[in-house]
Amino acid sequence: MRIAVLGYVGSGKTYVSNYISERKSIPCLHLDSVKYDNEWKPIDNSVILPQVEEFMEKRSWIIEGSCRELLIDERLEKADKIVILLLPRTICLLRVLKRKKEREQEGYKSDLNWWFLKFAMFGCRNKIRRRFYAEITNKYEEKTLVLKTKKHVNDFIQSIVD
C-alpha cells in the first residue's frame, strides 16, 4: 500500500503517518525531515529529490508532507490512497503549540515564530492552497479521502490498521 498524506500545518499528518506505519510495518518518509536540518534551514532540492525518488520505488510507503516541489505529481500518481487532513484552525493551532514545546524538550531549535504562526493559521489555508487540495480531490477522486474532523481521522486510521 502506498499512502500520500497531505494537509494543513498541525492537522496531524505526522501522527497519522506514524500510527499507520508502526502498526502496518510500512516505511514512512516525513518530507520535513529531509527538507530541513535540525535548525529548520532548508536543504537543497538536488540533495533531497534522489532520496524521495528512491523511497517511492518501494512496494509500500507512506509519504507525509505537502511540499509541492518534492515530486508531488509523481507521489500522487503512485499513491494508492491520498489522505488530505483539513482540520479546523483551533485544533491545528493547539497542536502547533504542543509540538513546539515537545521539540524544545528534545533539544531541537524551535521553528515557531510570528511568521510561522501566521503561515500555519492563514498562509497554508489561503485560496491557492485550498484550490490545490480541491484539484487533487477532483483529479484523484477515486483514491482521495478528505478528513475534516478528529473523528474522521480516527475512523480512517482504524479502518487501515484493523
For the regions a language model picked out, list residue spans one by one.
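Conserved nucleotide-sensing/catalytic segment adjacent to the nucleotide-binding pocket
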Residues: 27-81
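The conserved Walker
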Residues: 9
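NTP-dependent small-molecule kinase module
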Residues: 23, 124-162
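A glycine- and Lys/Arg-enriched "phosphate-lid" helix/loop adjacent to the NTP-binding pocket
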Residues: 86-128, 132
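Walker A/P-loop
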Residues: 14
